């Protein structure tokens, strides 16, 4: 049995696999109709007790989530487990944090680069700029929701973790 795998027996490629009246099924998956370039949205989850509290103090800590998906798929509600999702994190914080999740452009729309793009004065890595825009928005506006802009933690999973590294080094 093992000998067959080691020898590399030739395959008879002379037999037809499809006939002229047959066709292969389309291998391209149908696009999700919700997919759009218009994706710069934030979810801001504020516990009721934080939202109702007077906005006189420094506010509560803020946790910003950047999802993973290989920079090609995903969205702001993409969590690998309930414990890393907003409900689990808010529960473990005794409802004393604000959770922010942001979307960003993916695939070629978000991470296109190369000499042709550079020669045409295009902007590479727009997905990272989308993330930066979201983080800047949080810095400017989170106090309106009871958050402390000086206590913002950014976390991510997989490509989201890589994005955090890129945001720190840019």
Where are these regions (language model features)?
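Surface-exposed, low-complexity/disordered Ser/Thr/Gly/Pro/Asn-rich loops and linkers
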Residues: 1-33
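Serine-hydrolase-like catalytic core of hydrolytic proteins
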Residues: 29-170
């Amino acid at each position: 049995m093992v000998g067959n795998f080691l020898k590399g027996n030739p395959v008879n490629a002379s037999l037809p696999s499809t006939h002229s009246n047959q066709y292969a099924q389309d291998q391209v998956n149908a696009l999700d109709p919700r997919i759009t370039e218009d994706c710069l949205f934030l979810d801001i989850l504020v516990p009721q007790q934080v939202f109702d509290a007077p906005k006189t103090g420094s506010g509560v800590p803020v946790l910003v989530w950047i999802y993973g998906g290989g920079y090609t798929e995903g969205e702001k509600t993409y969590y690998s487990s309930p414990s890393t999702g907003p409900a689990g994190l808010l529960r473990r914080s005794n409802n004393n944090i604000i959770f922010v999740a942001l979307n960003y452009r993916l695939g070629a729309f978000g991470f296109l680069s190369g000499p042709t793009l550079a020669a045409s004065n295009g902007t590479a890595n727009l997905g990272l700029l989308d993330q930066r825009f979201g983080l800047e928005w949080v810095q400017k506006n989170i106090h309106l929701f009871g958050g402390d802009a000086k206590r913002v933690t950014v976390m991510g999973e997989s490509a989201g973790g890589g994005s955090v590294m890129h945001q720190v080094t840019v």
